[in-house]
Amino acid sequence: MATGNVIQVIGAVVDVEFPQDAVPKVYNALEVENGAAKLVLEVEQQLGGGVVRCIAMGSSDGLRRGLKVTDLERAIEVPVGKATLGRIMNVLGEPVDMKGDIGEEERWSIHRPAPSYEELASSQDLLETGIKVIDLMCPFAKGGKVGLFGGAGVGKTVNMMELIRNIAIEHSGYSVFAGVGERTREGNDFYHEMTDSNVIDKVSLVYGQMNEPPGNRLRVALTGLTMAEKFRDEGRDVLLFIDNIYRYTLAGTEVSALLGRMPSAVGYQPTLAEEMGVLQERITSTKTGSITSVQAVYVPADDLTDPSPATTFAHLDATVVLSRQIASLGIYPAVDPLDSTSRQLDPLVVGQEHYDVARGVQSILQRYQELKDIIAILGMDELSEDDKLVVSRARKIQRFLSQPFFVAEVFTGSPGKYVALKDTIRGFKGIMDGEYDHLPEQAFYMVGSIDEAVEKGKKL
């Protein structure tokens, strides 16, 4: 193995000089010996003259010029397979949960080609989530990609935790969770939530949190994806959760600036679309198995046209948009039913009844949105009888779109509810047809199925 020496350290970027005839390849892993501590670097650029520029996969504190560096002659490799289930690992696949070695039988490189055209397969099967607003308005496809878009504090992580809990309990497959640049507290909460729900032995956890160097946050999504690919290639249906894809982009921006590339729009890296494509093209289903991915996407300043969320949109099958206006009404999950979309919402896929109910709900809510200005200026009394009925039903639908979550029981004090798709369709169809016009609005707030709303209405 070739050895070189550190010649420059600038934060997370380290320049290493090797002999001219043994320059490491781009993406090779290098190991720096700094006393007892070992730091892994990843080669990003070859500068000529035997010098390579690398990104540190850990803190570069204590590094100095002249330290010996060994070329491992391979990319970063991480453990894959069943040994990773129930464990928490970092970007290098090292355990961070104090439970000893992973004991894996196989390690895979985190840089892998996307499946070829012949290997790809698409599915029309729906994945029931038990969350009314998602199942009705933006149904998920098995083996599809879903984005949860939202600004700060509107509930992306809570929605994702509820999805993981529901799917892990109702659908007995394996899941991989990649925490990319999120809060360590959330990672901790998530681990305990999974343990309490008895689904931890079906989930592999990979964390690269907010306080870690940009190299970790840029590569940790690939580490999680590699573990998911292994399960898929064994012929399984895997779930891959990434929280948060925006931090992946942001880490790329930091690395790009440190490597001296010229920034593009809004200061993002010039390779934004390519970096996103490299990750997203690997998250796909093949003829062997499927990867269904749910990705949380932070929307900077609630602006969906920002280059980062805009680049992510192109890769998704379904988008769940969380809205601050809906959250401010106290309706959780704060999903915007008029802004969320899904390719699966097609009568040929979901069936005519589901399609008609979803579109009917949207048209009632859209009409209510248009009438809001008139109500604000002139009041309800100025509306026609038909419009009054539309407003009354729209307000019931809006409240019925709320739902108590299992993972939020500690905050809401009410037990979580899982609602089957057929019950969801029956409930909204009934409200639209006027079967529940006699019930007060409050009866529909924070309940599961329509039967619970009727029961609640009797008590009010």
From Swiss-Prot:
Keywords: ATP synthesis, ATP-binding, Cell inner membrane, Cell membrane, CF(1), Hydrogen ion transport, Ion transport, Membrane, Nucleotide-binding, Translocase, Transport
Pfam families: ATP-synt_ab, ATP-synt_ab_N, ATP-synt_VA_C
InterPro entries recorded: AAA+_ATPase (IPR003593), ATP-synt_VA_C (IPR055190), ATP_synth_F1_bsu (IPR005722), ATPase_a/bsu_AS (IPR020003), ATPase_alpha/beta_chains (IPR050053), ATPase_F1/V1/A1_a/bsu_N (IPR004100), ATPase_F1/V1/A1_a/bsu_N_sf (IPR036121), ATPase_F1/V1/A1_a/bsu_nucl-bd (IPR000194)
UniProt subcellular location: Cell inner membrane
PROSITE patterns named in the record: ATPASE_ALPHA_BETA (PS00152)
Binding residues for ATP: 150-157
Major place of residence: membrane
Reactions accelerated catalytically: ATP + H2O + 4 H(+)(in) = ADP + phosphate + 5 H(+)(out)
Molecular functions per Gene Ontology: ATP binding; ATP hydrolysis activity; proton-transporting ATP synthase activity, rotational mechanism
SUPFAM superfamilies in the record: C-terminal domain of alpha and beta subunits of F1 ATP synthase (SSF47917), N-terminal domain of alpha and beta subunits of F1 ATP synthase (SSF50615), P-loop containing nucleoside triphosphate hydrolases (SSF52540)
Main enzyme class: translocase
Subunit description: F-type ATPases have 2 components, CF(1) - the catalytic core - and CF(0) - the membrane proton channel. CF(1) has five subunits: alpha(3), beta(3), gamma(1), delta(1), epsilon(1). CF(0) has three main subunits: a(1), b(2) and c(9-12). The alpha and beta chains form an alternating ring which encloses part of the gamma chain. CF(1) is attached to CF(0) by a central stalk formed by the gamma and epsilon chains, while a peripheral stalk is formed by the delta and b chains.
UniProt cross-references to HAMAP family, sorted A to Z: ATP_synth_beta_bact
Similarity-based family: Belongs to the ATPase alpha/beta chains family.
Official protein name in the record: ATP synthase subunit beta
Organism: Sodalis glossinidius (strain morsitans)
